[in-house]
């Protein structure tokens, strides 16, 4: 897990360090800032909001926040976060019929499920 977290911090964190607010289609931490948007032979050819670069979200939710679905359709789950990697975190993740909010303040872990109400 430490290798994965370091990769996320260095690679995707490198995008954030360069001003990204979404995940880019491709990123080379060694590339000069002047060429960071180059791709496909075009100076501004790179997509700056690309779904296939969003894998850290999956890794953080599953492996670090410890959200594991135990039943069909996401209605049953357990939360077993790896708090040892973080000073603190505040994470909200989707689950069936709602979301789960996981907060670690360095001392106390709080987990709360919120249901979406459907008024029909």
Name every feature range the model reports, one short phrase each.
Residues 2-120:
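Non-catalytic C-terminal accessory modules of carbohydrate-active enzymes
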């Amino acid at each position: 897990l430490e290798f994965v977290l370091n990769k996320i911090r260095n690679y995707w964190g490198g995008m954030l360090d360069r001003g990204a607010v979404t995940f880019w289609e491709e990123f080379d931490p060694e590339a000069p800032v002047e060429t960071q948007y180059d791709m496909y032979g075009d100076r501004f050819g790179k997509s700056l909001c690309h779904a296939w670069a969003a894998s850290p979200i999956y890794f953080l939710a599953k492996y670090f926040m410890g959200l594991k679905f135990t039943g069909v359709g996401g209605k049953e789950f357990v939360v077993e976060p790896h708090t040892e990697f973080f000073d603190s975190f505040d994470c909200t993740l989707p689950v069936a019929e709602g979301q789960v909010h996981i907060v670690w303040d360095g001392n106390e872990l709080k987990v709360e499920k919120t249901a979406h109400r459907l008024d029909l």
